Amino acid sequence: MRLRLATYNIHKGVTALRGRPRLHELRLALHRLDADIVFLQEVQERNERLARRSGPTRSSPLDVLSSSGYAHRAYGVNAIYPHGHHGNAILSRLPIEHHANHDVSDHMLENRGVLHAVVRAAPGAPPLHLLCTHFGLARRSRERQAGWVAGFLEREIPAGAPVILAGDFNDWQHAVDRRLRRVSGLREVFDEVERQDWFERFLAWRRPRGLARTFPSIAPWLSLDRIYLRGLRTHGARVLGGAAWARCSDHSPLVADVELG
């Protein structure tokens, strides 16, 4: 069975410079992605300041995003503050059997989590494990968080079970990438994708394998956002760029078509 995946750091649903709400633009953008499963980072499920500016509404930010065609969702709170909270989320067209959020914060200045959910591509199909994460800004924090993920995969997920690990890894030095590949046996979706853009091919020597540049969205240079797989095959992957996407977030979304089995 083929699935389309996407990962996207949505910058809390506001523009990077002026803090203008972009939820409805993001909803339309998610609809255009046409992904079966979307991994989101920096999702504000509650924001009283934004609610006051936008007027009375019964819909939470996650309600708005889910209305782009996703009947199933999971949300994990990472950071709580007086006017709201934010975290990671998974939107899915496939029913989510269960989910749990795991705190992987490394210090008091950053609240980080790994959201784990389980879906099945079809009745009777093996469980497909989804992990959505947003790693820390400090290298040592990221390395410890990668170690936590590696341990979780070893302890909690059967060796033959298919896994998708996606999110914003903040790994501009690529240490996390090397560890996840070496310890967990994961592959990144761009490993098997041939570069069509000559500039991308020219710069590929600066990054391990085929990691794609996603940040900043206005002129992507750093390879922060990724989709790692185990037990799935990649049929295509791309970064969506351009002015319209740059207006939605400071990250560019990453999309991959994969096959289970």
Label the predicted regions:
Residues 1-37, 68-261:
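Active-site regions of metal-assisted phosphoester/phosphodiester hydrolases
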Residues 15-20, 47-59:
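Short, flexible/disordered intra-domain loops and linkers
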Residues 38-42:
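Acidic beta-strand-to-loop metal/phosphate-binding motif
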Residues 44-46, 171-172:
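Short "lid" loop at the C-terminus of a central beta-strand within the Rossmann-like core
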Residues 46-49, 82-84:
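Short active-site-adjacent helix-start/loop capping segments
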